[in-house]
Amino acid sequence: MSIKVWPKSERPREKLLQYGAENLSDAELIAVLLGKGVKGKNAVSVAHELLNELGCLRGVVTATKDEFAKVTGIGPCKYAQFQAGFEIFKRNLEIKLQREDVFNNVDDTKRYLQAKLRDCQREKFALLMLDSQHQLIAFRTMFNGTINSAAVYPRELIKQVMIDNAAAIILVHNHPSGVAEPSHADIRLTTEIKSAMASIDVPVLDHFVVGDKETISFAQRGLLT
């Protein structure tokens, strides 16, 4: 049944305008982004198919083009719309970090890093370069690894820190396994990097490990001593 014949109070777009996006279900939000359905299916029906195929809202926005296309009638244009929306979300978080004191906004930092790294299929090691006010200068992916490791070289980190003229840094890497618990190797590496950065008087404020369901802060765990 076409959404046009639904009562106005039940149409996703009208509900959003009247009650706000936070009051829509995942399927209704997807339907608004889709705009319209495909032959024989309205936008809400297609949205449910996407959720069933890709598992959840996160699966929809992080799916590959081929995965997205498994739902009949959904082409590259719709995929591009969802990717653009997800990128806007990530950039908005980055802008927020650039305006605020990163170290005093651990939850915002976690959300930003989750958006950056949670769905990467290979391990990545990155630095948040901070100025003297602990505001974000840049996010730098320093090393790309395999599904369970990434080789990290402190000398290369020092070189990039000096190029960016960072006053402090935050370390971050993801665990593609989905488990964010820091390993003994993670703790040893953090100690090595702290020692290397001390040689140029740049403090390491935190080290985040991004997993599937959580992001762990070394500082909150007392692991930076």
Swiss-Prot record:
<comment type="similarity">
    <text>Belongs to the UPF0758 family.</text>
</comment>
<keyword id="KW-0862">Zinc</keyword>
<feature type="binding site">
    <location>
        <position position="186"/>
    </location>
    <ligand>
        <name>Zn(2+)</name>
    </ligand>
</feature>
<feature type="binding site">
    <location>
        <position position="175"/>
    </location>
    <ligand>
        <name>Zn(2+)</name>
    </ligand>
</feature>
<dbReference type="InterPro" id="IPR010994">
    <property type="entry name" value="RuvA_2-like"/>
</dbReference>
<keyword id="KW-0479">Metal-binding</keyword>
<dbReference type="Pfam" id="PF04002">
    <property type="entry name" value="RadC"/>
</dbReference>
<dbReference type="InterPro" id="IPR020891">
    <property type="entry name" value="UPF0758_CS"/>
</dbReference>
<protein>
    <recommendedName>
        <fullName>UPF0758 protein MADE_1000235</fullName>
    </recommendedName>
</protein>
<keyword id="KW-0378">Hydrolase</keyword>
<dbReference type="GO" id="GO:0006508">
    <property type="term" value="P:proteolysis"/>
</dbReference>
<dbReference type="InterPro" id="IPR037518">
    <property type="entry name" value="MPN"/>
</dbReference>
<feature type="domain" description="MPN">
    <location>
        <begin position="102"/>
        <end position="224"/>
    </location>
</feature>
<dbReference type="GO" id="GO:0008237">
    <property type="term" value="F:metallopeptidase activity"/>
</dbReference>
<dbReference type="Pfam" id="PF20582">
    <property type="entry name" value="UPF0758_N"/>
</dbReference>
<keyword id="KW-0645">Protease</keyword>
<dbReference type="InterPro" id="IPR001405">
    <property type="entry name" value="UPF0758"/>
</dbReference>
<dbReference type="GO" id="GO:0046872">
    <property type="term" value="F:metal ion binding"/>
</dbReference>
<feature type="short sequence motif" description="JAMM motif">
    <location>
        <begin position="173"/>
        <end position="186"/>
    </location>
</feature>
<feature type="binding site">
    <location>
        <position position="173"/>
    </location>
    <ligand>
        <name>Zn(2+)</name>
    </ligand>
</feature>
<dbReference type="InterPro" id="IPR046778">
    <property type="entry name" value="UPF0758_N"/>
</dbReference>
<dbReference type="InterPro" id="IPR025657">
    <property type="entry name" value="RadC_JAB"/>
</dbReference>
<keyword id="KW-0482">Metalloprotease</keyword>
